[in-house]
């Protein structure tokens, strides 16, 4: 079938809006009509060429919502007409990782997904007869996309796709990191480095967890009003100080902050976040994705004296079994999604959405098909 899509033909170049061909779903696959998709920093990261798994030409997009159109052989968990959110972190329930109960990092489709392919090692997209790669198992920058059954969460059909599409990545990542990775407790202190969608979601999650002091940190003070709306008690612009941000936080508590979250992808900030964590028990959670080949460093003394460095992917949330519940929470108002959507656009305007992101003028732009 034909589908309008925003295709990245080469790194560092604007997306091109073209009509592509989408093949029917094969065994264990599902064809969906995407209704809405967020434009995320991870899409921009891959488009920049810094992503070690980036392949081109590719249909980007991984933060979407849509409706099932057709199912392939053997698919039983969804049917045409079901409302779904594609998952870049699958949940098969059968691999070693799923069976362990210790992680959300299912590996059922990981090997092929990292190569931009469907589980059978081929692609369902083409343009003028030439194959196009998939992206993170989702490719929501196409009006129609094919996704593995294990990479779909079935959601309440009454949910507002313009809002709940954000649960496909950023908001779930931030809120989940608070509850699942850090396990923030009432009264704990929290510092959040970077106030994009993920960082703001961490702030909201910290408020849900009844954290005491919630410190929001960003060099763009225009984000502070929204941070306060989500629950920040303090907002700090590092540029307002003539000393490192670590020292600013240690002035607040000389022993450090109970939980720090790095939501940028800057290895220097990752170190600052760790070294701002509380002596004896502080945790620092890395959420931001650093560039290819970059490494983190600190003195071992920081860990010997009780600090813990952790990472979090998709907030530790298991997509098929747990994400539908988060959609219900959003519908009840327990998760506030509307403020994240600062702009809505058509697919034809998608390059403008990337510009707004790079200029720091948006939190999330949602593309409506």
Swiss-Prot record:
Has high formaldehyde dehydrogenase activity in the presence of glutathione and catalyzes the oxidation of normal alcohols in a reaction that is not GSH-dependent. In addition, hemithiolacetals other than those formed from GSH, including omega-thiol fatty acids, also are substrates. Also acts as a S-nitroso-glutathione reductase by catalyzing the NADH-dependent reduction of S-nitrosoglutathione. InterPro entries: ADH-like_C (IPR013149), ADH-like_N (IPR013154), ADH_3 (IPR014183), ADH_Zn_CS (IPR002328), GroES-like_sf (IPR011032), NAD(P)-bd_dom_sf (IPR036291), PKS_ER (IPR020843). Zn(2+) 1 binds at residues 40, 62, 169. Binds 2 Zn(2+) ions per subunit. Zn(2+) 2 binds at residues 92, 95, 98, 106. It is found in: Cytoplasm. It is an enzyme of class 1 (oxidoreductase). Homodimer. Its main location: cytoplasm. This is S-(hydroxymethyl)glutathione dehydrogenase. One of its GO terms (biological process) is formaldehyde catabolic process. Its cofactor is Zn(2+). It catalyses: S-(hydroxymethyl)glutathione + NADP(+) = S-formylglutathione + NADPH + H(+); S-(hydroxymethyl)glutathione + NAD(+) = S-formylglutathione + NADH + H(+); a primary alcohol + NAD(+) = an aldehyde + NADH + H(+); a secondary alcohol + NAD(+) = a ketone + NADH + H(+).
């Amino acid at each position: 079938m034909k589908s309008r899509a925003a295709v990245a033909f080469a790194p560092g170049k604007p997306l091109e809006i073209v009509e592509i061909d989408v093949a029917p779903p094969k065994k264990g696959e599902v064809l969906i009509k995407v209704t809405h998709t967020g434009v995320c920093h991870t899409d921009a990261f891959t488009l920049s060429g810094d992503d070690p798994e980036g392949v081109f030409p590719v249909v980007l997009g991984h933060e979407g919502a849509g409706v099932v159109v057709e199912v392939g052989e053997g698919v039983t968990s969804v049917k045409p007409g079901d409302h779904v959110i594609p998952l870049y972190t699958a949940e098969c329930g059968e691999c070693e990782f799923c069976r362990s109960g210790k992680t959300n990092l299912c590996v059922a489709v990981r090997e092929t997904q990292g190569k931009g392919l469907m589980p059978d090692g081929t692609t369902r997209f083409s343009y003028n007869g030439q194959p196009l790669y998939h992206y993170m198992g989702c490719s929501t920058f196409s009006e129609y996309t094919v996704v593995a059954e294990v990479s779909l969460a079935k959601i309440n059909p009454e949910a507002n796709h313009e809002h709940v599409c954000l649960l496909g990545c950023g908001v779930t990542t931030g809120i989940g990191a608070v509850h699942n990775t850090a396990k923030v407790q009432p009264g704990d202190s929290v510092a959040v480095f970077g106030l994009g969608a993920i960082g703001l979601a961490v702030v909201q999650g910290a408020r849900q967890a009844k954290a005491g002091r919630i410190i929001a940190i960003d060099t763009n003070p225009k984000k502070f009003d929204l941070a306060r709306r989500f629950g920040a008690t303090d907002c700090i612009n590092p540029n307002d100080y003539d000393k490192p941000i670590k020292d600013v936080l240690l002035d607040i508590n000389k022993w450090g902050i109970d939980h720090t979250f790095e939501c940028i992808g800057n290895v220097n900030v990752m170190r600052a976040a760790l070294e701002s964590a509380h002596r004896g028990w502080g945790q620092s959670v890395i959420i931001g994705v650093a560039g290819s080949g970059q490494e983190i460093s600190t003195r071992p003394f920081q860990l010997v004296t009780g600090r813990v460095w952790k990472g979090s992917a998709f907030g530790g949330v298991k997509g098929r079994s747990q994400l539908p519940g988060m959609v219900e929470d959003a519908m009840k108002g327990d998760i506030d999604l509307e403020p994240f959507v600062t702009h809505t656009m058509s697919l034809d305007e998608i390059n403008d959405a990337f510009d707004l992101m790079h200029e720091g003028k948006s939190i999330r732009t949602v593309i409506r098909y």
